[in-house]
Amino acid sequence: MAFWQPSQRLYLPPTPVTKVLCSEQYIRRKDVFYHGETERMLTVGHPYYEIKQSGSGKTIPKVSPNQYRVFRILLPDPNQFALPDKAMYDPSKERLVWAVVGVQVSRGQPLGGSVSGHSYQNTLIDAENVSKKVNAQGTDDRKQGGMDVKQQQILLLGCTPAIGEYWTTARPCVTDRPETGSCPPIELKNKPIEDGDMMDIGFGAANFKELNATKSDLPLDIAKDICLYPDYLKMTEEAAGNSMFFFARKEQVYVRHIWSRGGTDKEMPPEAYFLKPKGGDQTQKMPSILFGVPSGSLVSTDGQLFNRPYWLFRAQGMNNGICWLNQLFVTVGDNTRGTTLTITVPTSGSPLTEYDTSKFNVFQRHVEEYKLAFVFQLCSVTLSPETVSHLQGLMPSILEHWDINMQPPTSSILEDTYRYLESPATKCADNVTPMGPEDPYAGLKFWEVNLKERLSLDLDQFPLGRRFLAQQGLGCSTRKRVAPVPKVTEKRIVRKRRKGN
């Protein structure tokens, strides 16, 4: 049978995709589990901005309920660990690594809404209530505004920092030549989420250092900051799967008010969209820029993501919970405990009999309370050529941490080697300090938690450990049944007397 085919079309096979091995293909899990937990971790600061005291030179940090808390968990090197069984692995052919199988992030303090605002907010009119007509703007129409911000709970777990996304100004093309005062182009950028970075609270994920020129468009806690939103799309598509083993989130928001911005609107609606007023000025005076005031609404214990365990059986990426470089990153965002403490102090030491506002100093503080607990499983990696080659392409710092060097290429340059370097007749040796392993996150800010001396094999002595044992069908203690002792019955021997005796 003959078929007709167009001769001008040629379909090539698709380009093969570079395959990344799942960690379970070269990881051997041991039946050894360790429990590690932190102490109660507390932080206190101002909820909106950092304060530098002029007299003492000390700084009151910014501790906002709308900030991320990123914990960098430092684990001991299992290859230098005192293991219960020395025959567990062969150091010449294997390396030991940690795998996280359970995590619980516990939070203290009562629930409370997160309140923010600005004393001079760029709010022209209340656009949802049309009871009053405003014909013109003044020089300064700013007002005091407050709100309960978007409600968020975020929990991210990985062995590298989580990645956030935000919008910021971009460089215009050379041929555009934008005018002064025109709207700049914007672009989407990424950065690692650090401890203290701001979450999106209902006004978008953007660099407000560049986009908020009035310093009045946003609440005080984000007016000069970058609001980040976790880039779930990028972390999900990451080949290695290191930045996000799993995540849990809850977002809740509704528009409580609709206000308009003050300023000169350079992008007015076209004339075809409205009829001009009869008589008077034919130009539209009021701007058409509206924005919604967010509200996080009810805060309750029904939808809490914290104070409960999470068990990792299968990660969303190719890394199934392996803690490369003996570290773990826990990214937490939670503003459901956003209560701000108001502290009033009298200005004088004499007792007061009448209320006078001028005789009191008012301060604000926000407090946070955390406690982390983990269950780790001991694993081994066989140093086969395939595994070493895969790890070299995936994360070369792993092999450097294990003191495994790849064979360097043969140099074609003739180098000089001097003898008697300490002799006055020979040139001075190069003062080169041997470089140690560099910290790839040296310039980033994290809340470091050292668990190198806080691991224990006694899982039944800790709440998370007992829950893990219950998941495995084991209890905190086992009682051996006593086998019943069989009763020994003595047989009575009855002798018959012979007749005649």
Swiss-Prot record:
Record's keyword terms, sorted: Capsid protein, Disulfide bond, Host nucleus, Host-virus interaction, Late protein, T=7 icosahedral capsid protein, Viral attachment to host cell, Viral penetration into host cytoplasm, Virion, Virus endocytosis by host, Virus entry into host cell
The keyword Disulfide bond is assigned to this record: yes
Gene Ontology molecular functions: structural molecule activity
Domain of life, source organism: Viruses
Matches recorded under Gene3D superfamilies: Major capsid L1 (late) superfamily, Papillomavirus
GO terms, biological process: endocytosis involved in viral entry into host cell; virion attachment to host cell
One Pfam family hit: Late_protein_L1
GO cellular component entries: host cell nucleus; T=7 icosahedral viral capsid
Compartment(s): Virion; Host nucleus
Keyword Disulfide bond listed: yes
Primary role: Forms an icosahedral capsid with a T=7 symmetry and a 50 nm diameter. The capsid is composed of 72 pentamers linked to each other by disulfide bonds and associated with L2 proteins. Binds to heparan sulfate proteoglycans on cell surface of basal layer keratinocytes to provide initial virion attachment. This binding mediates a conformational change in the virus capsid that facilitates efficient infection. The virion enters the host cell via endocytosis. During virus trafficking, L1 protein dissociates from the viral DNA and the genomic DNA is released to the host nucleus.
Oligomeric and partner information: Self-assembles into homopentamers. The capsid has an icosahedral symmetry and consists of 72 capsomers, with each capsomer being a pentamer of L1. Interacts with the minor capsid protein L2; this interaction is necessary for viral genome encapsidation. Interacts with protein E2; this interaction enhances E2-dependent replication and transcription activation.
Similarity comment text for this entry: Belongs to the papillomaviridae L1 protein family.
Name of the protein described by the UniProt record: Major capsid protein L1
Species in which this protein is naturally found: European elk papillomavirus (EEPV)
